[in-house]
Amino acid sequence: MARLVAVVKYSDEDYPFEKRQMPLYIDDSLTMVLEFSDNMLNLDKQQIDTVQLEQFIQRHRMLKEQDLASAMTVTSREVFNALSQLLPCVGCRRCVERLFSQVMQTGIQALDPLSVGANGVLTLSHGFMTDATKLYTLFYMCGSKMNNELDAIAKNKKGKKNNRCKFHSLDVRKPKPVGGHWMDVWEVMSPECRDEVALIDSNCLLETLENYLQKHRFCADCKNKVHRAFNILTGELDFSKVKGYCANVYQGLRCCPHEGHIHLCCETDFIAHVLGRAEPEFAGGYERRERHAKTIDVAQEEVLTCLGIHLYERLHRIWLKLRAEVQTRQMLFYLGVDALRKSFEVTVEKVRGISRMDQYFKDILEEEKVQELKQEKKRQKKNRKKNKSSCDLPTPLETKSANPSQKNEPPGFMESDGNPCNISEDSNMCAEVTVKNEDLLRSHKVKKGLTPHSNVSDCGYSSSLEGSEPGSQEGSDVACAEGICKHDEAGDDKEEEEGDSCVECWNNCTKDNIKGKNKKKKKKCKPFKCENENTLKQVPYNTESSDSVHSNPNEETKVYNFCMDSEFPRRPWIYHRNEFFSDMSSTESQTRFYSGRETKSLKELLDESECSSQEEDEITQDDIQAFKETYQTFYRDRQQFRQCLKENFKQFCLHQNPSLLVGNTGAIN
């Protein structure tokens, strides 16, 4: 508990304040010395947690002397930032700022063991800095108690709309009924302070007397008698010349006429007696008697009542100043300790290398990375399944190829110069079509010897290196639908049966015929007829159903290949395909039914394959980024790779067909 230990005289401007002492300004005529005790650091060993103390000592030993001195230093900005967050009372914040400035300017040690330098830096004394036990007590024992006091201050507001505490509100400045407040402040005063409080100035007492007479509306005669009693008390009038004077009323009072002071007896009982006479005045009621002073002794009692009022107001003012200053000092002390504690913990965590908060965030980021990797694996697995389903067909029956050289032919759309539809590499007009397994002719059976990427089954279009040869009719829906395949004549002509046929008609063949075919070599495809005319001839489109087509095996139908003469410029195969379907009759449905199954036309299959390839085989940005990170030198050596591929392709073509290389020299380059 704080105590009032001394009085600062006006002549003592450079009063030697000791540790934990600070001036307390009561009014213009009274200034006392307020001293704080240091018993807050003297705690019992039972109140200290030994385990936490050992941990704190280990952290304290981690810091070097230079690091410890840096940790025990905080700026005023850090203190004031915490001040605005913790204290809702405006009066408390202003008092804390005033006390901080006062300590910084005067250099008093009111916050010992804390000190404020001239530059506004808050530091801790060297004795506490090096002692780990004292530092732990200051940070975690005293700080927790002060935190509870601050919570009590925040709850001690006068109202919901009023954020001021009880010591800075306007209501507390009004004197209340005489209670224990004056006793509390009287007990913490030293004898010197009590004598100073009991010393009443005559002019101040006269002012209180005038207010009292005006409040109770004394008559003129009574006012004169009260003034005469006051003059007797101050020594201006000789009491022996006044009739009806009672000396017992002024017992315990002594006046100093030359200095204009009135001295009261400093005994507690006498002070209580004087304050007791003023209690009805503050309680709101008074004894039922005439407010007149007909005699001098009654006038003396009125003067004594005014003296009690003046003394109580003075004690109440001292009590209010004392409590407010103690609260201000505690708040500033706690804010400084809390700022130092945070600075110490931050420095310790820096020495360790990583803070607890950073470790927490690091764990969260690691968990997020694990989740992202799982999601990425799921996406890659899903993409692989889609690519596999779009590229792979059911396992075909293997047969011996008629042309052994075609086994090593790479898939693609490259054609030789002998075919007018040939497209060179530099033209970049090659179209790649991908068809799903379930959409390819809606058939579960595949002709023997056909692979998913085989160029032999080209659906009526040539896509192999032997581009000069016309495409075969094997697996062609158009050829079968138009009656070109002539599968119904297979029984009459065995040589025709050994040739190519579409997949749907192939399903009707017996197992014996299949076994027989495996022993024979495959015939070469018969080329389509190309007319050397300037205009393209349209293919007659049979509007009859598929059943009627197969029912007329003897009907001869000519199928013209949509290719141009050498006089026309070269155009991509997709252009001829569009011309082919544009000339067909729009009234005929493009959906055919074979053996009770619904099969789409070639145009629909090609259109769907283009859409599916764009949707399913699209390369994502993640794949592009991963490729760039893995093969960083790819773009740098791209031209070298390109030239190497050209040379390898030349060697491959030379090995397959030397005569073909001579005709395709321009296309390869």
Curated annotation (Swiss-Prot):
Superkingdom of origin: Eukaryota
InterPro entries per record: GGNBP2
Keyword NADP tagged: no
UniProt region (Disordered), positions on chain: 375-421, 452-475
Subcellular location: Cytoplasm
Comp. bias intervals (Polar residues): 398-408
Single GO biological process annotation from the record: cell differentiation
Keyword hit for DNA damage: no
One GO term describing the cellular component: cytoplasm
Keyword line: Cytoplasm, Developmental protein, Differentiation, Spermatogenesis
Biased composition, class Basic residues, residue ranges: 376-388
Protein function: May be involved in spermatogenesis.
Name listed for the protein in its UniProt record: Gametogenetin-binding protein 2
Organism in which the protein naturally occurs: Xenopus tropicalis
